[in-house]
């Protein structure tokens, strides 16, 4: 959920996570099982399709297509393997992310870092914390790049799936105008601010990621 924190900032509170179980005996294809459960979870928690961020890289693109057809085309596709955006690195660093980060996934992982450092991200699962702290990165070249997922999995024996899910939540917030900042926020100047100000402290429409 998203709302006003006691530190004067608007932040993200991670309240729950769910691992979708696949029924091997079902005649329904795996991706359709996942899509069905994702939609059910979103509807149970009042998450609108336009507030659902999904990793559209690789097989994720097929899942996006299914959800777009069976639920709504307004779901938010995120190409983790794509190019970094032209958004500023932060309110204090006006350089384009595409000038600093080698790819989108690096941009998103460092965006989470910004939100955590500025005390705007709370309730992170212990497993996700370990994943964020375990992934290596290289900032000695012209552009910063994080370790490839396949390399991290080979090195640690685990894929950073919990951490990737959190990056999608933060990306959803950023798409709505949310940003990490060292300063207290003074007014509703973005769609993100307005959404929170229009509600009683906590914004009851929630966001999700896959």
Describe each model-derived feature in a short phrase.
Residues 135-149, 153-210:
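Acidic two-metal-ion nuclease catalytic site recognized across multiple nuclease folds
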Residues 2-143, 191-210:
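Mg2+-dependent endonuclease catalytic cores in nucleic-acid-processing enzymes, primarily RNase H-like
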